């Protein structure tokens, strides 16, 4: 894990994060009848036609299927590396996996959203469009991810990459809703993001006394797999859909025979997604300790056995991205990812470093999050690239694209985004009002099962901490293979009276050390750096530092 950190202060419109894992989502289900799901679930009719008969009509289709780009706009070769701004490897690894998700990338490169977006404040779709466009159009270079991507989430230390990933996906889903806020919740599941990543669970309970059947459905955007007793992803999926007996104290209260009776409960995938996000539950929700074991995962995965209907043909998915955590705890270590470019070549994306890899190396990792896409979808996007232009052959400069953080220059061409992208980033970073933020917080209460660790210390009155870690224990020792960060912030934390300070930079570390003794008896507070007050400028030695504004009381 990187030693030094940067707190990205400021408000973000998508400030509430609810983790959307769905390994056993039964507690969140609302029991409904078979006829209460949409008649045309966004993804089911293409892959599981026989499932559509049980579903009810949608009040409004927010993102019709025909609006998804049918042809690929992605460059065939791999794109840019991402600069680590201090403890942001989890951000970079997650963004690379999303950047190389074909349906999402193609939609972003079409720029259809920015042409119709009427929001005047932060929009995650606009921000992601700008990022993906820059990343894919700057191969061989290193770019700085927009601070708006992590605003309201990053607190200057290691965070959970899966939490950030789903925070971003959920924010993009919410960005599809302006202008459609009065629609029913089924129609909300027809958004562009749900069409790409979403599907439906079916929880079926069968009373063993009267043989009555109750079906409950719930949408999902990712699937969490328990790996404690599993040696492979297939075994974890089998355990997930294994029937459960309800008897004794757990007997089922049947709504048909109106009595408590033994029952059988089964959880299956009712509709499949274009893109599957499978998260391997490697971290304890209480301590954050890691399950350090190898779990095998295939390059091609047939999901037919885990569907509600198994009497049709294979439903094959192919692997296109892997998010990896190196370390023994969620509080330390390092995140990186492997992605499959549209030309078919695998690459390791390790912050600024981009190197060619092989499928053998990809399948040998201790994966944390796996990304699969339907084989038919991948082939369709790959064929469109072949028709458009021939993939560029790997040359010597492509085989090992290494651009370290020390090689970045202030006038590096890749740091200059296209004119449209700059406009989008500027619009996305505008802050929402405090009243609006409070309203959203009231409307989106944190789920009870989401354990939020209380933040000690005092924050400036104009700073809002949107996301807090779910883990209760504090930070542990750093991973021995720590990364060096661009920003060397002092370990000194401001006192209650100095909590309005924006931060201490590397160039002022001496001053911070001299004042450390004066503050050692004061209550510790979080170090807060406002991103907007930092400016990029070179030092005499060629390294990069940042000008800032600091106020003392």
Curated annotation (Swiss-Prot):
Q: Where are the transmembrane segments?
A: none
Record key words, sorted: Endoplasmic reticulum, Hydrolase, Nucleus, Protease, Thiol protease, Ubl conjugation pathway
Q: Which residues form the USP domain?
A: 80-375
Write out the GO cellular component annotations: cytosol; endoplasmic reticulum; nucleus
Q: Where is the composition biased (Polar residues)?
A: 496-505
Q: Kindly list the cysteine pairs connected by disulfide bridges.
A: none
Q: Name one GO biological process term.
A: regulation of apoptotic process
Q: Where is the composition biased (Basic and acidic residues)?
A: 382-392, 398-413
Region Disordered: start-end pairs: 382-413, 491-524
- Gene3D superfamilies attached to this UniProt entry: Cysteine proteinases
Q: Which InterPro entries match?
A: HABP4_PAIRBP1-bd (IPR006861), Papain-like_cys_pep_sf (IPR038765), Peptidase_C19 (IPR050164), Peptidase_C19_UCH (IPR001394), USP_CS (IPR018200), USP_dom (IPR028889)
Q: Where in the cell is it found?
A: Nucleus; Endoplasmic reticulum
Q: Which residues form the active site?
A: 89 (nucleophile), 334 (proton acceptor)
Q: What is its main location?
A: nucleus
Reactions performed catalytically: Thiol-dependent hydrolysis of ester, thioester, amide, peptide and isopeptide bonds formed by the C-terminal Gly of ubiquitin (a 76-residue protein attached to proteins as an intracellular targeting signal)
Stretches of Basic residues bias are at 510-524
Any one Gene Ontology MF annotation carried by this entry is:
cysteine-type deubiquitinase activity
* This enzyme's EC code(s): 3.4.19.12
Q: Which family does it belong to?
A: Belongs to the peptidase C19 family. USP17 subfamily.
Q: What does this protein do?
A: Deubiquitinating enzyme that removes conjugated ubiquitin from specific proteins to regulate different cellular processes that may include cell proliferation, progression through the cell cycle, apoptosis, cell migration, and the cellular response to viral infection.
Mind telling me what this protein is named?
Ubiquitin carboxyl-terminal hydrolase 17-like protein 15
Q: Which organism is it from?
A: Homo sapiens
The gene that this protein is the product of is USP17L15
